[in-house]
Design a protein with these regions (language model features):
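A short, Lys/Arg-rich alpha-helix, primarily the initiator
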Residues: 1-17
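DNA major-groove recognition helix of helix-turn-helix
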Residues: 9, 34, 53, 61-64
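Key DNA-contact positions within bacterial/archaeal DNA-binding proteins
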Residues: 17, 28, 58
Length: 64
C-alpha cells in the first residue's frame, strides 16, 4: 500500500520506533507500513498512526 509515512516521519523528525512506542503498535507492523510492504493494514492501525502524526488517514495514504 502506497503511503506518505516516510515523508511525514522525516518532516517531523521521528522514527518508526517513536511511533511504535507511542501508539502501542508493533515495530514490525509499522516497518511494513513504512516500507510500503503492508498489504491490508487495518483501519485501526492507520487511524492510530494518523492520530499520532496529527494527520488524516487521507494525508497518510498516497492518492493516485
Amino acid at each position: 500500500m502506497k503511503n506518505n509515512m516516510r515523508v511525514i516521519l522525516a518532516k517531523k523528525r521521528l522514527k518508526v520506533a517513536d511511533v511504535a512506542r507511542e501508539t502501542g503498535l508493533s515495530k514490525s507492523t509499522l516497518t511494513a507500513l513504512y516500507y510500503e510492504r503492508a498489504k491490508n493494514p487495518t483501519f485501526e492501525t492507520l487511524q492510530k498512526v494518523a492520530d499520532f502524526l496529527e494527520v488524516t488517514i487521507a494525508d497518510l495514504l498516497k492518492v493516485g
